[in-house]
């Protein structure tokens, strides 16, 4: 009887642990969104990425209000987990809670918008190694926490847009 009870408890724990893991992974996916940009540069020492991304025409007009190195909040147009183009740019106020899930703070690298692309910087020290094969001018896929107010933690990952095929 005691062995049966132990066996039932072990099975219950295994099933429960598997369910918890699946919930954690899906919750993480639901709390992030992905967007694509052109890699300009990576400062390996600081983990700072400089990227160009597309802006909607109305948002592009607003960039002239800012100067290089200003902290701004970019808000992406998007649905579910996918950001398309930047739809809004605003001054970053670290005391204000971000309510839009597709917004995160960055540093404006240049107030010049060329062909509806804006250049900005963000920190993602843990992602530097994953883009060693990416050259400036190539595209990256960036996963960002929804509504993150902390620029160090906003970006979850940066990966090559075209991942090399694995040999498995």
Which residues fall in each region the model found?
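Short, flexible, surface-exposed loop segments at domain boundaries
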Residues: 2-7, 12-168
